């Protein structure tokens, strides 16, 4: 088995391209957080996500805790994956899973 590697805290298109060129399988793009490194704005997250080839996953790390906030955050960034970094209630998982996401690429 060959492990897949996610590089987190990507902060620019240049860093994203560098990680991709070195073989990253996924990129972590950190949204607004109460603390910690690597936070970038939603517009930059979307800009980076749009240049990444389909073979590389993009993770939007969100500290939002309600289903609606998480869904709205994703709609502002359009990454291929949502990474929830805080505790949310079980019903939120169901709402997020059932959301019909549309990608406008």
Residue ranges with predicted function:
Residues 1-91, 95-105:
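Conserved N-terminal beta1-alpha1 strand-loop-helix module at the mouth
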């Amino acid at each position: 088995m060959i492990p897949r590697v996610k590089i987190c805290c990507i902060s620019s298109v240049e860093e994203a391209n560098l990680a991709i060129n070195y073989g990253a399988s996924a990129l972590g793009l950190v949204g607004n957080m109460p603390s910690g490194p690597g936070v970038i704005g939603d517009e930059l997250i979307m800009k980076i996500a749009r240049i990444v080839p389909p073979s590389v996953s993009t993770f939007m790390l969100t500290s939002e805790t309600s289903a609606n906030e998480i869904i709205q955050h994703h709609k502002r960034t359009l990454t291929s994956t949502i990474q929830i970094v805080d505790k949310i209630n079980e019903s939120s998982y169901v709402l997020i899973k059932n959301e019909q996401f549309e990608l406008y690429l």
